[in-house]
Every structure is written in C-alpha cells, then in structure tokens.
C-alpha cells in the first residue's frame, strides 16, 4: 500500500494541471488527498476549479455537477505505479462550461432539472463502460436543450445488456454538437450509434466526424427520423453487409468522404450524392488480424498506402487521426505528466537513512 500511496501523492506534483484551484480526491484510506469523496470535492469547489481524481480500485460513484468545473483523471488505462485508474458512475449535468476528461465512467447525461440551455460541455479522452447512452440528453423531459457540446477522443465499448441501448441519445433541443475522434464499438445487434434528432429545420445540427466505428454484428447507424447530422471523414468497419447507414426517414443527414468497408462483401453507398470510399480495406499500422477491435496496444493510424489517407473532408485522413485532434489510446489529458517508473536511487540503504527514489515520467502532450 505504501508503494501505491507514494504514486498517488506524486500524481499531482508535476505539470500545469496542478496549478491553483486544483482539488485532489482519493477514496482510499490514508491517501494524501484533499478530499475523500467526489461529492465532498464538488461541494467545496468553485467555478473554474479542477477536481482531480487520483487512481483508485474503488468506484467514485455518481455525481451531479452544478458549477462550471473540470473533472479530471489521469487517463483510462491503469496507472503503471498504482495499477489503478479513476472510475466513476454517471455524471448528471445541470450547468454550462463543464469538462470531463481522462476518467473511466458510465455516462454523462443532461439532468431533467436543467432549466436553461446547457452550453459548452466537453467530454474528452474518457473510456465508457455499461450498456450505452454514454452521452445523453434526449431523455431529459423538462430541460431546454443544449448547445456546443464536444465529445472527443473517447473509447466507447458497451459491455452490458440491454443490447438495444444506443451509444448516444440527442433531441430536437440540441444544436451545434461535435462528436469526433472517438473509437465506437457498436457491439450489440439492436444497438444504434445515434438515437434522436436535431432541431426541426436546422440542417446539420450535429457533426459526426473522424470517428472509428466498429460493428460486431448487423444493425443500423441510427433509428431516428430527422437526425440532421453531417457524417464525414469517419471509418466504418462493418461486419454485416446488411448494415443500414441511413434509415429512409432520416432527413437532412449526409454521409460525405467516409470510408466504409466490410470483410463480408460489398456495401452500398448510403449517400450517392457525395463521395465515400467504398469497399476498400483501410489498412491500419498495427491491428491484430486487421480487425479493429479495441486494444490499448493497437495502432489505429492508417498505414502508408491506405485508401483512407487524404480522402476525408478537405483532404484530411479518415478515422481517429485525421484533422487536428490528437487521439491517444490511454486517454491521458493533454499536458498532464504521466509516470513511467519509480525505483530506489541506491541498492544499499544504511540503517535509519532516508530512502531516495528516482521517478521517471512523460512530460505530457
């Protein structure tokens, strides 16, 4: 335990993320942090603060966030020193200007009690667990909707029933959304990536771009009419050729400059009015068996000669590494140092002498 506590105390000693107004949280006994629970930290926080969750084998639980803050973990892959990561339940949002990054969590949802338009919410570099509805606003019946939500760099791998739960649920009250650079495993047969629709009459209220969507079975991209989405520069790896990209009722939705491939046979271009790269294997740098199931050790970058290079919108690459966002498999927030090793400085330590250690870390992106 002392080894783990040492790593936890060092977690916040380096880098810009540990500037003023950082509230550290650890739910382990005798842990050197300011707060022992997420609820306690949220109660003490002020607008603009960073609530930093230290790695722990214990779940931090659900939380309702009512002030503009950042909830930050050290990434969604186990810390090499403590063997843990920050895991939480569902974040219920009742305020604008919220950022959730670098944690392992169940969902971010818009609270039904949110009485105004909730703007500028960022969900970045997280990994999601559970059945789905990982980012959801459409089931909140009394709120006024959302604007300028950004969902980037996340890993979404449903691992629980029911298998009809969508990955995202949005509503006609949501506008100016961007869902981009996410790894999405559409695992279940009746699961949809997008459920719901943007504002009636507002074309392309939702941008869905530079994502990698892997489907484990047959299904459809959306079960909504009037989705009002612009889907570009994505990489779709589809197991079943019967997969439906766009239901006939989905108006104002476009598929532009995507790569769509199935190893089982040819797919039909869902939007003949635009160019999509159809039925050409994407060719990744390092993916086991060429099938892009999620693995933290895989490299989902496009290999030289891939048909997806330069074929995204405006000449970008399709998939996770096109455009300007820097996707990383471990979900480490930009600028946050990460520890790689710790060792004693000397092989022999005299009796009653202090123990000196050497710590190595990456300085962050």
List PLM regions with ranges.
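Bacterial Sec-dependent N-terminal signal peptides
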Residues: 1-22
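Acidic Gly/Asp/Thr-rich repetitive segments characteristic of extracellular carbohydrate-active
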Residues: 21-59
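Acidic glycine-/aspartate-rich tracts in secreted/extracellular proteins
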Residues: 28-31, 49, 55-58, 75-78, ...
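Well-ordered beta-strand segments characteristic of repetitive beta-sheet solenoids
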Residues: 51-53, 70-74, 98-102, 122-126, ...
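Right-handed parallel beta-helix/beta-spiral solenoid domain characteristic of secreted/periplasmic
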Residues: 62, 68-113, 130-132, 159-160
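Predominantly extracellular beta-rich ligand-binding scaffolds that present long acidic/polar faces
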Residues: 66, 112-115, 156, 162-296
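Short, compositionally biased P/S/T/A/G/V-rich stretches that sit at domain boundaries
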Residues: 318-355, 360-364
């Amino acid at each position: 335990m002392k080894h783990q506590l040492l790593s936890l105390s060092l977690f916040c000693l380096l880098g810009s993320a540990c500037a003023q107004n950082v509230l550290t949280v650890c739910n382990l006994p005798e842990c050197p942090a300011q707060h022992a629970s997420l609820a306690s930290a949220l109660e003490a926080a002020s607008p603009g603060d960073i609530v930093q969750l230290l790695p722990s084998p214990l779940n931090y639980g659900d939380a309702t966030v009512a002030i503009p803050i950042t909830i930050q973990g050290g990434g969604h892959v186990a810390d090499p020193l403590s063997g843990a990561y920050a895991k939480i339940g569902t974040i219920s949002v009742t305020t604008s200007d919220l950022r959730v990054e670098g944690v392992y969590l169940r969902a971010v949802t818009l609270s039904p009690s949110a009485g105004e338009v909730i703007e500028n919410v960022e969900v970045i570099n997280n990994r999601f667990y559970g059945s789905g509805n990982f980012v959801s606003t459409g089931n909140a019946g009394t709120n006024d909707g959302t604007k300028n939500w950004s969902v980037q760099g996340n890993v979404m791998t449903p691992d629980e029933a029911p298998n009809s739960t969508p990955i995202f649920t949005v509503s006609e009250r949501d506008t100016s959304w961007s869902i981009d650079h996410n790894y999405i495993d559409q695992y279940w047969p009746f699961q949809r990536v997008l459920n719901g629709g943007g504002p009636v009459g507002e074309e392309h209220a939702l941008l869905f771009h530079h994502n990698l969507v892997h489907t484990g079975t047959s299904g459809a991209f959306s079960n909504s009419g009037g989705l009002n989405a612009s889907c570009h520069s994505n990489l779709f790896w589809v197991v079943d050729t019967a997969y439906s990209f766009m239901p006939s009722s989905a108006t104002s939705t476009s598929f532009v400059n995507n790569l769509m491939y199935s190893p089982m046979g040819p797919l039909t271009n869902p939007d003949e009015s635009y160019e999509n790269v159809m039925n050409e294997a994407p060719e990744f740098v390092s993916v086991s068996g060429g099938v892009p199931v999620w693995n933290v050790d895989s490299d989902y970058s496009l290999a030289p000669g891939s048909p997806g290079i330069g074929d995204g919108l405006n000449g970008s690459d399709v998939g996770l590494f096109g455009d300007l966002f820097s996707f990383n498999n471990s979900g480490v927030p930009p600028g946050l140092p990460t520890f790689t090793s710790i060792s004693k400085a000397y092989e022999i330590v005299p009796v009653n002498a202090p123990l000196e250690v050497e710590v190595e870390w990456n300085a962050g992106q």
